[in-house]
Regions:
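A common structural junction motif
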Residues: 72-74
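Short S/T/G/P-rich N-terminal loop/turn motif that feeds into the first structured element of a domain
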Residues: 1-70, 79-96
Length: 96
C-alpha cells in the first residue's frame, strides 16, 4: 500500500533558491539510495509554510529511506535550511 511522508516547515525567504537546489539534490540522492519513491511534491502555502509530500510505494520503502537519510549528505544540507519542522506519515486509502 502506498504511503505519504508529509513534512511541514518554514524557510527564510532569502534561502528559497538554495532550498530548491538542495531539495532537488536530496530527491536524486534518495532515489539513488532507496527504491520506491514514486513522487516528491513541494508546495508553499499562503502563510509562508512549505509542505513537502513524498509518495512511497510502501511503508517499507519509506522506512528504508528514513533509515538511510543520516548517511546521505544531501539530507543534512537540505534540512539545515528549514525551521519549525514537523512530519506526518499517512497511508493512501483511496484514489480516484
Amino acid at each position: 500500500m502506498a504511503t505519504l511522508r508529509i513534512d511541514r516547515f518554514t524557510v527564510d525567504p532569502a534561502d528559497t533558491e538554495q532550498l530548491l537546489a538542495r531539495r532537488n539534490a536530496l530527491v536524486a540522492a534518495i532515489r539513488d539510495a532507496v527504491p520506491g519513491l514514486i513522487e516528491a511534491r513541494l508546495v508553499r502555502l499562503d502563510d509562508g509554510h512549505w509542505i513537502d509530500m513524498w509518495r512511497w510505494d510502501s511503508a517499507a520503502s519509506q522506512q528504508a529511506a528514513v533509515a538511510a537519510a543520516p548517511t546521505i549528505p544531501e539530507a543534512a544540507a537540505a534540512f539545515s535550511l528549514v525551521g519549525n519542522h514537523t512530519t506526518e506519515l499517512a497511508e493512501v486509502v483511496d484514489e480516484r
